[in-house]
Amino acid sequence: MKKSHLVKRGLQDANQPSSQPDKVGWIRRFSGKGIFREIWRNRFVMLKGDHLFIFEKEMKNNGKTHEVFDLVHYERSEELRKAKSHSKKNHSKFTLLRCQHPGNKSPNLVFLAVSPEEKESWINVLNTAITRAKNRVLDEVTIEEESLLAHPTRDRAKIPLGRRLPTRGHLMAVGSASSDGMLTLDLVNEEDAAMLDEDEWLKDHRASLDKLAPGRRRAGTDASRPPASNTEAQEKTSSLPRKSEISWSQEDHPRTPQNKKKFAQVRNRCASMDDALSRGERKPKKNIPSPTGHLQDLITQRLQRTQELLAQIQEQEPHRGRMGSYPYLRGIDSPRLRHLKGSDSPHSKGSSSPHSANSPSVRAKDSPSSKSKESPHAKSKDSPRFKSSKNALRSKSIDSPDSKESSSLHMKCIDLTHIKGSQSPLSTGSNSPHMKSTDFYQMSYSPNFRNMKGGDSPLGEALDWDSRRAAAERLLQEAISSWREAKEVLAEVKELQARQRREELSKTGMASQKLQQKSP
């Protein structure tokens, strides 16, 4: 039976390789299956290098090889055992598996050793030879002398270890002595580049700050720069300022270097160290100042707005203080005018005029509604709060040059309505409905008062001004209430800040305790 699957068939001289073989011995080789049983033939096998030689007879001086197998085409050698076989041959079989590369025609070899120990020995030797054959391509690589790497510093003279590096002054002297002077120019340019102006350094510092912390920029405003004015900040939003914005707006000027040497140090440091240090330096301070200034600015803005409204009302009535200068009011000595001038008024101490005797407002003094003026609710008009608000309003709205005529009819009428009418929002202490409307409406519904009120008389204009003044007082009351609300909000903010500080202190204390417990 001819074997057509052999790798090499021919006559080769076994003595040709001069080195000693790795292993030799007789092994039975599997040659196929017969009709009733497997066919095993004895062969003399020799392993030398990365080749496996198989002989039919024992090798002699002029022995010729029967088959030669190159172990490069094989993958590994392993034990071959059937699952349900109790034969002694089952314990000594091993195989040599070929590689699964395309075009590889080497056969799988199956051998039967004399004993299991001999089988293990052949498996180990064959696996070692296969590994050596795989690495043969790398071992055969030779490097020619011409292709060696050139070492430009191998033959260079070495500097002694104790020698110092040249200083800048020495380099400047050498550069000035040279003909071209390029070295001197380079050194001077390097020094000029190191000595940057503080403005340029601050611009770079701010640019890097914006790149590192883009979250600080919100709604088109740069939080790293302080706002231009408080009014501009309040026009943008009417709510309380944020915590991060407070910390960056109230922070002092950016840290500038102390001397010129720090510029060169900052420029020479590596970027990673600069970023790491700058992140730590740019953290906001833990002790954030309280936002009292912003709240006070908000309150003062509300008060300024109220003053502006009062000033606008005063400008709308430029002739309100000139009522005493009308010629038809100077020479008139009528009882009706004396009734309104104050001393003979029925709402003052007493009156002897016929109009005051017959006026329904005089009779109203004995009414039960007028007696309620002596009640404790009516006494609240004389409280310090009422007096202070009244004086503040008078100082803001009546101190103009047009309103300095204190004896005019207009001012007396306004004082009369303040004392008797109690329509001002500041006199909130009088909770009685009779207290608010009795005297003023009795006087307004009297026939004498109706005659004075009709037409375009100055008294009608004074009453119109009184209603506008009441509106101004209402605005002032709203400003005072908003100021109180701002104070309450400020107290809440302070309480929240104190709570956050206590939580931070407790966290740091717990962390320090854990570190102390871990350290021993």
Curated annotation (Swiss-Prot):
Subcellular location(s) of the protein: Membrane; Nucleus; Cytoplasm
CDD domains: PH_PLEKHO1_PLEKHO2 (cd13317)
Any GO BP annotation: regulation of myoblast fusion
Matching Gene3D superfamilies: Pleckstrin-homology domain (PH domain)/Phosphotyrosine-binding domain (PTB)
PROSITE patterns in the cross-refs: PH_DOMAIN
Low complexity bias (residue ranges): 348-361
GO cellular component, one term: nucleus
Name under which the protein is recorded: Pleckstrin homology domain-containing family O member 1-A
